[in-house]
Amino acid sequence: MLSASGGRGIVIAEQASDLVECKLYTRYIPKKDEYRIHILDGKVIDLQRKAKRLDAGEVDWKVRNHDNGFVFVRENVKSPKSVLTVAQKAMEESKLDFGAVDVVYNDQNSRAYVLEINTAPGLEGQTVVNYARAFREYLNK
């Protein structure tokens, strides 16, 4: 299910008997927080954190996607410096001009891990404004 979006199709296999046939397997990383860092030309233009929707009720904290009651928020979001650093490094290594990097932070070992780079991230609200401003500056330099 490599063409899925929004975290749909995720299966957590806690033991070998839970495995299902698929095209991609990845290790689960315990996390305290999950962030989306929007980057253009090496600069952070927007920072969001995944949070439980107020009306979500009981949720599965391992799979933090929209269908499971999570949304991206930007109010009062502060991340460890390593979250921004690994996001910028991932963009640099991938040679992409812009994208939204999903990063989880494990506070037990104080490490940030890149989950993926979204090359066509969903944009709405203030994120659209931030991208428009950043692209204007980028194209006018």
Feature names for model-found ranges:
Residues 1-35, 40-45, 77-85, 138-141:
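Active-site nucleotide/adenylate-binding loops and adjacent lid/helix of ATP-dependent enzymes
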Residues 7-11, 56-57, 126-129:
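Short, charged, surface-exposed secondary-structure boundary motifs
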Residues 43, 47-54, 117-122:
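Short beta->alpha transition motifs characteristic of CBS
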Residues 54-77:
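Flexible internal linker/loop segments at domain or repeat junctions
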Residues 92-96, 105-141:
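C-terminal active-site "lid" helix and adjoining low-complexity regulatory extension at the edge
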